[in-house]
């Protein structure tokens, strides 16, 4: 595990064998251990082994804190509940029904990932309703020995929350503050369907800035500071990506051709600032074809 500060660490889940794609934060206190975004079931062997080396078993974990329910963040929860039925799972109210019955979530994901579902995500099992603590935003919760402020931060997903640890000055922001898998690289907005909302996203970024955190923690990937310049860069790239998607919709041709054009433009933008291998990590964290679909859906809904 990589230490952030006393009692707060994180695990590189080595998703699909790649480093710096998905991070799980670990909060350790005398009353128990909390994991923020435990990741997909396919990465649980790495999570278990890394925790074990730190002297932590799944039975020692008391809480799973979800920023949102996308499979790369929350897909492993049901398996962990089978191993430790005493776990409490904190989740936004809009995501809770899909944790209890993941059938619709899996159907939606299957349309995006097709035959790669099992390889990418592993077993996605239901979470018992009694294990859930439902969040709306505005709460203060205790988990992993820390007092955490919860804020509703939609835009990337309608069921997204962020957690702010006041004493450590760290905000755990999931995907709302984007993807930055290379420390010196760009910050990129993941915009998959179905509920991208650019106006809500902008408000959520202002809410994150309002925490006054010294560090924000991205699930993709890890701690980032200073916060202000990171958020400014994300706003700029979110504007650029949404503009590209809008431009693509005005192009002649099929949606497949529009999507391919958008993907090429995103790759070109990233490869101006880093080598091809690092640029590929960004696609592992948030595929550009899916980002086009999310933004295209947003613009088409706006057009009526």
Specify the residue positions occupied by each region the protein language model found.
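Metallo-beta-lactamase
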Residues: 33, 40-42, 60-72, 99-152, 158-228
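Histidine/acidic-residue-rich catalytic or RNA/ligand-binding cores of hydrolases
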Residues: 227-236
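C-terminal regulatory/interaction regions
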Residues: 244-304
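Divalent metal-coordination and catalytic microenvironments
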Residues: 7, 27, 37, 47, ...
């Amino acid at each position: 595990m990589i230490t952030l500060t006393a009692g707060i660490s994180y695990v590189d889940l080595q998703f699909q064998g790649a480093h710096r794609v998905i991070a799980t934060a670990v909060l350790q206190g005398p009353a128990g251990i909390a994991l923020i975004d435990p990741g997909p079931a396919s990465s649980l062997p790495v999570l278990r082994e890394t925790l074990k080396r730190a002297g932590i078993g799944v039975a020692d974990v008391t809480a799973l804190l979800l920023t949102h329910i996308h499979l790369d963040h929350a897909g492993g929860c049901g398996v962990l509940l089978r191993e430790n039925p005493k776990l409490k799972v904190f989740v936004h109210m809009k995501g809770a029904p899909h944790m209890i019955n993941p059938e619709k979530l899996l159907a939606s994901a299957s349309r995006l990932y097709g035959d790669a579902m099992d390889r990418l995500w592993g077993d996605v099992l239901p979470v018992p309703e009694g294990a859930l603590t439902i969040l709306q935003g505005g709460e203060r919760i205790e988990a992993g020995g820390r007092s955490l402020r919860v804020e509703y931060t939609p835009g990337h997903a309608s069921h997204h929350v962020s957690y702010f640890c006041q004493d450590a000055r760290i905000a755990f922001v999931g995907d709302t503050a984007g993807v930055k898998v290379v420390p010196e690289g760009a910050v990129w907005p993941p915009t998959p369907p179905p509920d991208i909302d650019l106006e809500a996203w902008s408000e959520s970024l202002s809410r994150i800035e309002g925490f006054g955190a010294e560090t924000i923690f991205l699930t993709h990937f890890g701690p980032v500071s200073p916060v202000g310049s990171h958020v400014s860069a994300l706003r700029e790239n979110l504007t650029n990506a949404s503009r590209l998607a809008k431009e693509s919709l005005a192009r002649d041709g099929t949606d497949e051709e529009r999507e391919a054009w958008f993907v090429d433009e995103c790759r070109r933008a990233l490869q101006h600032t880093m080598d091809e291998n690092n640029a590929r990590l960004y696609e592992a964290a948030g595929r550009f074809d899916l980002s086009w679909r999310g933004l295209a859906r947003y613009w088409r809904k706006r057009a009526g």
